[in-house]
A protein has these predicted regions:
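Signature for HUH/AEP ssDNA processing cores
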Residues: 1-61, 70-75, 87-132
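"Short basic amphipathic alpha-helical interaction patches in structured regions
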Residues: 79-85
Length: 132
């Protein structure tokens, strides 16, 4: 049986709507709320020629922006106090909202869509956060 997919996007992206993905499996996330998160995503896009890695934004509530990073890549480093790390570990479980690429996914959408298997570069994200 052929288990490879012909999908042009990662298998963790749902076909429709949105789903919660457990942190630490395919990725972790760094959440930055409000306009700060949007400005950070746009700044990373400029630094990476338009491809910062997958970034999800939320349209309501805190208007959170989720930067999808490699699993466990945020550990053992200081982060700014206004940042939330969504990771897993002993006694810790977190879930990350992931929208489909098309269709009705409100209140979630892709600020930057996933391309291939690349995620947001954790050190670049961290450096950009401290440079604000």
């Amino acid at each position: 049986m052929n288990t490879e997919s012909d999908r042009p996007y990662p298998a963790w992206v749902p076909a429709r709507g949105f789903q919660l993905r457990k942190a630490g499996v395919q990725f972790d996330a760094v959440r930055v709320d409000g306009d700060d998160g949007r400005a950070l995503a746009d700044g990373l896009a400029r630094l990476t020629a338009g491809d910062p890695g997958p970034v999800v934004e939320e349209a309501n509530g805190r208007r959170s922006v989720y930067f999808l990073v490699p699993p466990a890549s945020t550990a053992y480093r200081p982060w700014p106090p206004d940042v939330t790390r969504l990771t897993s570990g002993p006694g810790r479980i977190a879930y990350i909202p992931v929208p489909a690429l098309n269709g009705c996914t409100w209140p979630l959408s892709w600020r930057h869509r996933p391309r291939g298997g690349d995620l947001v570069h954790t050190q670049l994200l961290r450096s950009a956060l401290f440079a604000r």
